[in-house]
């Protein structure tokens, strides 16, 4: 059985002003707390749980936790299974047993909840192989909407990446847990 999600904080104490800069460097930490029902945890807590062998497998989504702390980087080498969703190569993917390439924020639809609790919608700026830039045809450019595979402007490189939620849904389907969105 898996435990509840473990939400790490990325706080740099003292690096804050009264206008824009926050100590918490994670753009969607409030959204992660609201979705998971968990409070933010420090990397030290994760480090202790792995050392005590209370965590044998770790599933990391779109985060580079090995870069947070040198001690955490070392202890991740001893974990039995490390699975990572990542948008690019980093210290955590280097240690991972399984890596899933996931879409960047510029390749997917979604929302983020800022530190004030305001929901901010993100829309893709780059088309991937499986998804156009809009959920509906209303917001598509004429090039996107009317272009065919024979048009030169449609021949640009499209990457084969999926949003993390689709990767999780595909994994669950492989384990006979049927979910569809």
Language-model features and meaning:
Residues 1-181:
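Non-catalytic alpha/beta scaffold blocks inside enzyme catalytic domains
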